[in-house]
Amino acid sequence: MRALLIIAGLALFLVVCNASQVNEQRKLNEMLSVMFAVEEPQERDDCLGMFSSCNPDNDKCCEGRKCDRRDQWCKWNPW
């Protein structure tokens, strides 16, 4: 009877430890996702995102991007 109680206690201990570890891993994954989330700034539906092919004479790149005349794709424009 004592051996069965010890085995049940160990099994319960392992389940609690595993649940705690899974919860901790989930919190870490959420934190990393928030830290490394890259959101494309796109206010208009018709604007072109980063690295999209564009026409320099009719620049439809999203805010913060500019159509490059030489490469003809939307590049980041800090100014």
UniProtKB/Swiss-Prot annotation:
Keyword tags: Disulfide bond, Ion channel impairing toxin, Knottin, Secreted, Signal, Toxin
InterPro entries: Huwentoxin-1
Signal peptide segment: 1-19
SUPFAM superfamilies listed in its UniProt record: omega toxin-like
One of the Pfam families matching this protein, by short name: Toxin_12
Main location: secreted
Cellular component GO terms, alphabetical: extracellular region
Subcellular location: Secreted
Tissue: Expressed by the venom gland.
Propeptide: 20-44
Disulfide bonds: C47-C62, C54-C67, C61-C74
GO molecular function, one term: ion channel inhibitor activity
Function text: Probable ion channel inhibitor.
Domain comment in the entry: The presence of a 'disulfide through disulfide knot' structurally defines this protein as a knottin.
The family this protein is said to belong to: Belongs to the neurotoxin 10 (Hwtx-1) family. 34 (Jztx-26) subfamily.
Protein name in UniProt: U16-theraphotoxin-Cg1a
Source organism of the structure: Chilobrachys guangxiensis
